[in-house]
């Protein structure tokens, strides 16, 4: 099922996305995301954004979509736990190590493959589903986006 997913790099873009009909927004919270150039959100702002979106029927996805070092994993685990506690609907990931970490730190939180995971075939999307990812953001250049499956 397709959804209109919009970036939210700060409060103004979050409100614009919601008011423009986005089904879901993705945003950075903390240091471990590919949206480092965006304003991103503090923990308190993230909680406010989740409440704002959920009151309007919009889902919130945390971006945890960069490659992490072993030293960064404990901080990422804490971030996953906080995001789950604050009501995030899912996490966009790139790194299969984060997939494993998330299964331990926040097993109830659905995982989505970010475009940074570089899935571009129907076979790759199916394998991600077999491994428990509930949504895949295909590369925009992907022919698999044309598939009916």
Regions found by a protein language model. Give the residues of each.
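Hydrophobic faces of well-ordered beta-strands that scaffold small-molecule active sites
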Residues: 4-7, 25-27, 60-64, 91-93, ...
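Active-site-proximal loop/turn and secondary-structure-junction residues that shape catalytic pockets
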Residues: 9-12, 31, 64-68, 96-98, ...
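Catalytic cores of alpha/beta
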Residues: 13, 122-127
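Conserved, mostly hydrophobic/aromatic
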Residues: 17, 95, 128
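Single conserved hydrophobic/aromatic residue that forms the stacking wall/gate
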Residues: 140-149
């Amino acid at each position: 099922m397709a959804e209109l997913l919009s970036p939210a790099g700060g409060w103004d873009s979050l409100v614009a996305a919601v008011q423009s009909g986005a089904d879901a927004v993705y945003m950075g919270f903390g240091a471990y995301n590919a949206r480092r150039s965006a304003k991103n959100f503090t923990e308190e702002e993230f909680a406010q954004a989740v409440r704002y979106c959920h009151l309007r029927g919009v889902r919130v996805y945390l971006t945890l979509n960069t490659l992490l070092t072993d030293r960064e994993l404990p901080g990422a685990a804490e971030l996953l736990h906080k995001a789950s506690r604050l009501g995030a609907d899912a996490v966009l990931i790139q790194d299969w190590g984060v997939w494993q970490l998330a299964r331990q730190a926040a097993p109830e939180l659905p995982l989505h493959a970010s475009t940074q995971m570089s899935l571009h075939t129907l076979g790759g999307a199916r394998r991600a589903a077999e491994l428990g990812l509930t949504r895949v953001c295909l590369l925009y250049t992907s022919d698999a986006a044309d598939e009916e499956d």
